[in-house]
């Protein structure tokens, strides 16, 4: 599993964080200073990269959190097999199957021999863009 660590206080909108074992993109960060003897708290709202579910994280700003390492690759579509697509990586020439995207904009562009950009996050793959 490819992850690194950072503090909650360093998270910004648009960055990525692991919440409940799922990589998520941060959409909102609010920080609140508590009383005399408490530490500052941060409320992080994020959306799951794979599930699309909204997740929240409430923690002290100095707490360590996991940040996924995103590997970006270029591939070529070999075959459309219904709910999955067979893709060949253009750097390593490895072939594998990947879930077909549910977004209509991406699904309409899928055809054999088209190039695509996919991300590999924590051992899972997701199609981001079809060229």
UniProtKB/Swiss-Prot annotation:
According to its record, what are the GO cellular component terms? cytoplasm
> Is-annotated flag, keyword Cytoplasm?
yes
Q: Which residues form a coiled coil?
A: none
The Swiss-Prot or TrEMBL record annotates one GO molecular function as: RNA binding
- Give the GO terms filed under biological process for this record: positive regulation of translational elongation; positive regulation of translational termination
- Asked whether the UniProt record includes Glycoprotein among its keywords, one would answer no
Q: Which UniProt keywords apply?
A: Cytoplasm, Hypusine, Initiation factor, Protein biosynthesis
Q: Where in the cell is it found?
A: Cytoplasm
> Which InterPro entries does the entry mention?
IF5A-like (IPR001884), IF5A-like_N (IPR048670), NA-bd_OB-fold (IPR012340), Rib_uL2_dom2 (IPR014722), Trans_elong_IF5A_hypusine_site (IPR019769), Transl_elong_IF5A_arc (IPR022847), Transl_elong_IF5A_C (IPR020189), Translation_prot_SH3-like_sf (IPR008991)
On this chain, the residues bearing Hypusine are 36
Family per similarity comment: Belongs to the eIF-5A family.
NCBIfam families in alphabetical order: eIF_5A, PRK03999.1
Described purpose of this protein according to its UniProt entry: Functions by promoting the formation of the first peptide bond.
Q: Any idea what this protein is called?
A: Translation initiation factor 5A
Which organism is this protein's natural source? Saccharolobus islandicus (strain M.14.25 / Kamchatka #1)
The top of its lineage is: Archaea, Thermoproteota, Thermoprotei, Sulfolobales, Sulfolobaceae
Question: Could you tell me the gene encoding this protein?
Answer: eIF5A
């Amino acid at each position: 599993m490819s992850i690194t660590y950072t503090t909650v206080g360093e998270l910004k909108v648009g960055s990525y964080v692991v919440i409940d074992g799922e990589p998520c993109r941060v959409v909102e960060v609010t920080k609140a200073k508590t009383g005399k003897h408490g530490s500052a708290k941060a409320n992080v709202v994020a959306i799951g990269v794979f599930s699309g579910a909204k997740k929240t994280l409430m923690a002290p700003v100095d707490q360590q959190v996991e940040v996924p390492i995103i590997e970006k690759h270029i591939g070529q579509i070999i075959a459309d097999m219904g709910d999955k697509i067979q893709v060949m990586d253009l750097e390593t020439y490895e072939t594998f199957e990947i879930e077909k995207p549910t977004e209509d904009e991406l699904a309409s562009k899928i055809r054999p021999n088209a190039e695509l950009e996919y991300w590999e996050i924590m051992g899972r793959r997701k199609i981001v863009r079809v060229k």
